[in-house]
Amino acid sequence: MAPASLADEQLGPSVWGVSDGRAGNAAQVRAVMRALSSTGRRMQIAHIAGAGHRETPIVLTPRAPWTLLPGGSWPMPLAALSKDQRSLFQPPFPDVWIAAGRRSAPYTARIRELSGGRTLTVQILDPKTSADKFDLLVVPQHDDVSGANVIQTVGSPSHFAADHIETTGQAFADLADEQGKSCIVILGGDSKAHRFTAAAADRLEAQLTALAQQKWRLRITASRRTPVEIIARFRAFADKVGARFWSGPQDGPNPYLAWLLYSDAAIVTEDSANMLSDAAWHGLPIHIARLEGSSPKFDRLHESLISRGCARWFDGTLSQWQYPPLREADRVADAIMEKLIARHPQPALKGVKDQSVVLPDWLE
């Protein structure tokens, strides 16, 4: 496979992100990679000489019948991949491997074996197999998985890089000049647990109509899972009440981050841990909009966000309150950094003997 995003030399450890191609899984991998590459953490692990760093996640697409088996019992998992994808599993192996999704788990375990344990392996989301196969297992608290090497997160590990925030803020600076209160409305869609039915759309549209009449500026965005008929419906609604609407490139540059930055509140449908976590990362008052269906796992997610003060159920009214932003990707990145430093201790600084010299935190 042509390593288009492969850098042979870089400052610090080499990191590979891996996903199974699902957008939500890839987003969590990118979030942890971005958090790990923040300036403060990068300086603490800059002494680790890595090779073969990849800036963007690798997509592994195993085929049947392997994909029909439990994640912990795939015989010869490399045989499930294409020739190009199999070619990735050869030296030099990365210092850190960060993967998400059940179908990536057999390859996380395999890279650990092939590297002789040198690669620090991080698996995100419940792989439905033993946590002992990974150096770190990162799972949502609502999945109810525990262990010595398990990090439980509230929601998903979201992260927005400072430079991305700055450039987005500048590109959409006109939003800062708008008068009155604004609300981002994030629409999900059908999933195993929830369905975006016509009845749910009726209820939400009526509630948004009332908010528009109260002079709330609405910014509505759809996701990849939003049914086409729901997209069409809320696009027409936005035109009718003067709201903004975005569902893809045909609507112009993606304003998702800008709307998170420049909104006073958020309405998020209940079906997506990632979307709820994005709003919580920004500290927005989250109003969870109900769809049809439920699951014990999502019930626990909603309760954890509500108990932390991040969210409330949406009843048609918008409130504003404050809470510490939810920065779970940073917590995961800190755990990765600590394990890296334990494996690769920072070198002593020659010539620094004066105990009165106070070093920056990242040099201590």
Each model region followed by its residue ranges:
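Leloir-type glycosyltransferase catalytic cores
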Residues: E303-E364
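Donor nucleotide-activated moiety binding/catalytic core segment of transferases
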Residues: R235-N274
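Active-site and donor-binding regions of nucleotide-sugar-utilizing enzymes
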Residues: G17-V18, R22-I151
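Conserved catalytic-core segment of nucleotide-activated headgroup transferases in glycan assembly
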Residues: D190-A222, T226-P227
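A nucleotide-sugar donor-handling region in carbohydrate enzymes
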Residues: A131-T197, F314-L326, D330
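Catalytic binding pocket for nucleotide-activated donors in carbohydrate/polymer assembly enzymes
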Residues: N274-P324
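Short, structured helix-loop element that forms part of the nucleotide-activated donor/catalytic region
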Residues: R225-A238
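Short internal beta-strands
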Residues: V138-V139, L218-R224, H287-R290
